[in-house]
């Protein structure tokens, strides 16, 4: 059994210094992007998925349920990006959401086994009414953008913490 370290004023001070030092390593901003702009920047390569990200693993049903959540206007978790020296943004968390949105809007993904919007089973983006397509593309997503000075180790650590 490990001996517990006694909490002393010196340890409290050292802990505070460590906390402040590590907090300074992560600077970020939040931005809201419309779905249309997110997809445009992703298609152009302005937003990209790094090598350390796991491969696209959502099953068709998970992708459909995510699209259904967007159509229903449900809150969608933040995506996390990080700035790069070349001006692009690396997708730290949100790659599967981004790929699913692109697959639905650009590549004719068909919805299936929806939980609530059962009348949309078998629909692709193009099958939706013009008004619904416009609303879908104008839906905003909140993105946390880490400063470009954020190291690869910190980015990977954040990815691992979010996805555990």
Question: Where are each of the predicted segments found?
Answer:
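A short, surface-exposed helix-loop junction/capping segment
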Residues: 43-51
